[in-house]
Amino acid sequence: MQKLFTQAKAFSRRILKALENYGRKGLGVLTLCSLLASSPVFAGIPLKQGDGAVNDAQVNAAIEVYNRIPASIRLQYELNHNSITFFNSKQRRDNVIGMYTALDGMEANIMLSDQDLLGAYALAHEIGHYFDDVVYKDEEILLQEKRYGNQVFRYVTRGKRSRSEEADFVAIYQQEANQNGLVTQYEKSDSTEYFAGSFKAYVDTPEQLQVVAPSTYAFIDQLVTEFNASHPVPEEAVTA
């Protein structure tokens, strides 16, 4: 297990070195297709030891999901020194399998349940919350905090912190959520959860998402395209 956690840190070190060598200015923009085709390079995952009882199967499942996320989003998550941990599900009674906490994508932590593989498979949903957060500047938010074990979870009681709370995506949510069978009933509960669930579908089954919820797919795809352009991945990091 310790070997897996050690290997999980390799991606950050390689990316940071590439940025030191080349800087961000003038780096070519790589297409999403080419980034995903090169995903074996991103073998690591920014795991931090939590209080969960994690086994190799859970870590490997999380790594497999993580490597399906667009590379520009993974890169930014790691460059901001954000982390992923597993929490002890036996100490909780609310059946939560994943949580995301951050401020504009900074000081972020994704917390996953150590119950079977449920937490690992929820990773794309939680990264969806991160992406929704990092592309949007918080507006007049009021935060409260809860502590889960040794982790602090921040949640908003007022204001906006996500792109999916804007009127254009709320309209898409109201139009397509009920017909989108790729998301759960919980993910249909509001526009932010719908964005996270649809981002997971965008990562897992993009062709199906494009069929059942075309406006949702187009919205997320446009955000990813714009993020790729504004956060290019160093070519050395992709081909190393």
List each model region and its residues.
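A metal-dependent hydrolase signature that marks the N-terminal structural subdomain at the beginning
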Residues: 2-4, 8-115, 215-239
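Active-site-flanking segments in enzyme catalytic domains
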Residues: 77-240
